[in-house]
Amino acid sequence: MRSHFFLFATLLLLISCKKKNETLFVRLENSKTGLEFRNDLKYTETVNPYTFRNFYNGAGVAVGDLNNDGLPDIFLAGNQTSNRLFLNLGEMRFKDITREVGLDSEGYWTTGVSMADINGDGLLDLYVCKSGPKDGEKRHNELFINQGNLTFLEQSKAYGLAETGLSQHAVFFDYDRDGDLDIYLLSNSGRSIGIYDLRAGQREIRDPEGGNKLFRNDGNRFADVSVEAGIYGSAIGYGLGVTVADLNGDQWPDLYVSNDFFERDYLYLNNQDGSFSEVLPELLPEISMGSMGADIADLDNDTRPDIFVTEMLPATWERIKTKTPFEDWDKYQANVQAGYHHQFNRNTLQRNLGFRPGTPTPIWAE
């Protein structure tokens, strides 16, 4: 009996001495970091979800070393509040320098923001996307060229990048491999959602306000080459995310574009001649319906890029049954035949299985 007691006590001691899980992340209070920022939204008579469909699409953030001191700085975008630029002081402390560097922008409905060395001078510049209601003040994208002393010069018009559409985000990449950065500009259409939209042929009709665009860097100015490059720019492209990666292993950058609502996503393979081929239906068997964003990485360490897409699948069965659209078989097949592909309300992970035998075409399985 006594031996049983000692055995039980030993087991209890071993269990109680189990190694605690290590903490991977610790929340730092903004009172200590100095990162004081809130993107609050307020309804007005002229600006609300009924007058501006993308009211709740949110804003962006960019991180980069703007003054080349080895510390990453943070730019936080605001919709109805001003953008904020925080200078990294070291030891996770930041200083708001927005006004002193001339980047205050309250009321201009900023969406995405990117940091990139646009003019090749070794300094990160800022490209700030704008959206908002049609009568919104100063609704054009802004390009802030870094002057090297934590001051910036707005030169969007000089560079041909003062777009006045419904910009969501911009990604910088060298699609033609000529040594400078080009731009894919993602937009989210302001067009209302309706069942009449599900018909063929709309993808080829360009929309100057809500359509995506590709800009080629020609040195001191950018040229819109969307049409000649084969980039869709219609009103049904409700873009929310764009990702750059070499998807077929030819050492040229390709694109994956996430579209919300009924429009399918786009997968562009680089043709190495300044143009792209949009080939998603041939390569991906099924995709997310209301795609939010995508990321591309080698998830299984087989050296091949996999694609993960997030979706708007509700968290509870009640919302799934009340919010998810259901279609009969004939209507579903008609949508597929009209070019909208096989779409489902859930996240999707496209695993890269390699190449089709004897071809340079990759195979993905969901």
Residue positions per predicted region:
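Bacterial Sec-dependent N-terminal signal peptides
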Residues: 1-22
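Acidic, glycine/proline-rich Ca2+-coordinating loop motifs
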Residues: 17-366
